[in-house]
Amino acid sequence: MLMKRIKYIFVLMIGVLLLSGCGKNYKPITYTKFIENFNDSEKFYVTDDTLKYESIFERFIEVNGLNSEFTYMEFKTESEAKKYVKTNYKNNSYYKYKTSGNSIVITSNQNKYVYGVQVDKIFVIGQTPNKKYKSEVNKNMSKLGF
């Protein structure tokens, strides 16, 4: 009887741990923090293309590296950001699209690796044309808080 109760408590604890990772709430990142993350490294070249896209975005920053690239898009409103992500990623079978807490997360593992997160009016996407550099994308997205 005691062993059954211990097993039950153990299984319950494992279940709680597994479920606690679901629905993660990300925090929006500022463009200055985004730029600082990549300015520290000589591997990346940062370009602020906001003026080129000012009719669509509040901020548009691209970071290009040897093996990966990252884009920071700050929309004028959260609804514009969600619409952009849904239009470009939700109905495309190439991407996995899921809502997680207060954000939308997209990934793809076909041919190239893509990892993007939309929080509030911010959408950040990292990608690499070669899946063997997936860890570089994940490492930098993790540094950004995703």
Over which residues does each language-model region extend?
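Bacterial N-terminal signal peptides that target proteins for export
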Residues: 2-10
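Alpha-helical context
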Residues: 10, 57-61, 113
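Alpha-helical hydrophobic membrane-insertion segments
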Residues: 12-15
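C-terminal motif of bacterial Sec signal peptides marking the signal peptidase cleavage site
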Residues: 18-21
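Bacterial signal peptide processing site
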Residues: 23-25
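Short, solvent-exposed recognition patches
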Residues: 32-108
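A short, solvent-exposed beta-edge/loop patch
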Residues: 96-146
